[in-house]
Amino acid sequence: MSQILFKTKTFWYGIALTFCIATLSYFLAKLPFLMILGQLVTAILIGIIIRALFPVPDKWFTGIQFSNKVILRAGIILLGFRLNLVDIYHAGWRVFLIAALCLSFGITIVYFLAKLFGVDKKLAILVACGTGICGAAAVVAISPQVKADNNQTAVAATIIALLGTIFTVIYTLIYPILPLGPDGYGIFAGATLHEIAHVIAAADPGGSSAVDMAVIVKLTRVALLVPVCFVVAKMVNAGTKNRFSWAELPVPWFIFGFLATSAINSFGIIPTSVTDFLVICAYFLIAMSMGGLGLNVHLPSFGKMGGKPFAAALIGSVFLSVFGLALVLLFHLAG
């Protein structure tokens, strides 16, 4: 009984740590030199700094992972109360095409570079899918399809978490000089950044319309996780005795929750004052997940894993950013 209680306590300690990070980031983001980054990016950076400077107990990571995954999805579902489904219709087919093209390009270029650098095939697939689809969630989903071991999965997830954080900060800083309006910037961020959390954090300086568009585009990429898993599993298992299982395919159910809250908001069922409060709660929950994301970045581990997969993902992410920006401009969606 005491062991169960102890585990329960450490679980809540992890959640409490992300709660404190979210609270601290809320106030720090009001400072002039951090205002440009915003609360969400600040939360990521606080998490990274805490992990680098202080020994975070391993047992706390159960709660931290809960914040990083479950609380993030709860925040995204609540964020739907700010979106009107009419906005999705107005986004048009070009937006969804950009999402699909960037996903395909991201996976292809990173995998090609990883193999060029001599990275193990399984690790190359994990890093490529993490870059092209939805970050660490894609890494974890693809891992059983390619029969990757725990070390390969952890390495790929760490690479994506760190790269996504770096690019989130860069996007936030260069937004004022990009030839993009809020909607165009949201499409660009949603089509090219790694994690859903990264997308929301990077789009936040562009305002509500940028975040809404970014979430729509990013969730389009997330929705494609299932067919990508299917294709990867069939390709990897071709010519082997391994049997494909539909039960192993991951389904991102939280997307339906996001669409449901968006529909409720579109019909005006809930008063604006209530939805405004729910959106504030959504941002706080997402900030908690940002803190968890930062806490998962273990900088010393990069000295052990080698730089090849990181270099492949870094160069591939740069190409993906340029490709995504070019598509937004080509399809005349910069505004």
UniProtKB/Swiss-Prot annotation:
GO terms for cellular component: plasma membrane. InterPro entries: Na+/solute_symporter_sf, UPF0324_pro. Pfam families: Cons_hypoth698. It is found in: Cell membrane. It is a multi-pass membrane protein. Keywords: Cell membrane, Membrane, Transmembrane, Transmembrane helix. Belongs to the UPF0324 family. The chain crosses the membrane at residues 10-28, 33-55, 91-113, 123-142, 155-177, 251-270, 277-299, 309-331. This is UPF0324 membrane protein lmo2147.
